[in-house]
Amino acid sequence: MTDEATARLLDRFLGGLGALDPVAVWAHGSLAGGDYREGRSDLDLIAVLEENAFRLSTARALVGLHRRLRAEEPLARKLHCSYLTPATAAGAGRSHLTWAHDGPMRRPVTPVTRCELHTFGRVLHGRPPEGLLPPVPGSELRAFVVRDQKEFWRPAVDKARLWRQDVWIDLGTITHARATATLREGRLITKREALDLLPGLGAPQDVVDDITRRRYEEPAPAAPAWTDRRAERTRSYLGPAIDSLVAAYGTATRA
């Protein structure tokens, strides 16, 4: 069930796209998967526009739309959207115009996102992913997950300053649990399922409890001593855990 402020933002966003007559608008992530928490979860969207609608003036109009929403709707800071066309949707490695983290950028629509769209994507407008977005082979999904753990998350563990921030604690541990489930069982899991899985993977229980409390309850500000200890405990867990996961699955998923 979508909360009132989220529903209002989505209505305004879809209304703003109306002049471009989008082929489709889809939600993935927590908003589609059933673990959405208003004000805490991101709103992860994909919009497909017709080829002849995509030009420089279109990009400017989209940036203007996001900036207006950001100024008028508090939740808009959480809204991320990548813009594809039917012709560019097939390229998993291709970068697309994206609004995320308060600004425009170009980035790919990853194999994980593509699998989410096919597995539990939510159609907000127009056509479903089938027929527009090619399915992702299991081997491609597994290879991406291993590469993401090895090339992005493992080097990040060594950057101590990052891990004093909630977002790195949350995403680092949850992404690792989700990667483990994908590689072991071939399935995508929600953040709630990832948190349930983490203690069995050896994650520190107090860190898991901290993430759970901040996501699902009303968290109190963390004391500096806990922030430092949490960072150390998370890094001490994730480094060896990622190394073990990559060692176990890296060779099997290598192209």
What kind of feature is each model-predicted range?
Residues 29, 33-64, 78-83:
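Catalytic metal-binding acidic patch
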Residues 154-213:
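Extended, basic/helix-rich recognition subdomains
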Residues 63-166, 173, 179:
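Conserved NTP/Mg2+-binding pocket subregion across the NTase superfamily
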Residues 5, 50, 54, 164-168, ...:
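Conserved aromatic-histidine-acidic binding/catalytic patches
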Residues 187-255:
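Structured mid-to-C-terminal alpha-helical surface segments
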Residues 13-21, 65-73, 241, 245:
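Hydrophobic, Leu/Ile/Phe/Ala-enriched alpha-helical segments that form helix-helix packing faces
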Residues 8-12, 61, 175, 233, ...:
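Charged catalytic carboxylate motif
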Residues 1-26, 56-59, 254-255:
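Helical scaffold of the NTase/Pol beta-like nucleotidyltransferase catalytic core
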